[in-house]
């Protein structure tokens, strides 16, 4: 089942980025990115907005997986 965690991993890998590179680009810690990707934490709304803008995807896609 695809989740926000798996979508973050897929988007990051498709962009050819390491967790550290993504964290640096978004001014976040690598640990935060790691926790999101493993599903141990869910990104807050500000981080979700940052991720959607960074990867140029809709909030619907990032949160729910729909391409609306």
Task: Kindly give the residue locations of the regions a language model identified.
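Short amphipathic helical patch at the helix-1/turn junction of helix-turn-helix
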Residues: 2, 13-14, 42, 53
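Hydrophobic side chains within well-formed alpha-helices
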Residues: 4, 8, 29, 58-59
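Short basic helix-loop element that most often maps to the first helix and adjoining turn
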Residues: 6-25, 50
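Conserved hydrophobic/aromatic packing and binding residues within compact polymer-binding modules
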Residues: 8, 22-23, 33-36, 62
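DNA major-groove recognition helix of helix-turn-helix/homeodomain DNA-binding modules
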Residues: 27, 46-61
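Recognition helix of helix-turn-helix/homeodomain-like DNA-binding domains
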Residues: 28-43, 64
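Short amphipathic recognition helices of helix-turn-helix/homeodomain-type DNA-binding modules
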Residues: 61-68
């Amino acid at each position: 089942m695809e989740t926000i965690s798996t979508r973050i991993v897929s988007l990051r890998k498709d962009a050819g980025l390491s967790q550290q590179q993504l964290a640096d680009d978004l001014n976040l810690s690598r640990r935060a990115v790691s926790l999101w990707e493993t599903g141990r934490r869910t990104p807050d709304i500000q981080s979700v907005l940052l991720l959607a803008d960074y990867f140029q995807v809709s909030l619907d896609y990032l949160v729910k997986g729909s391409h609306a």
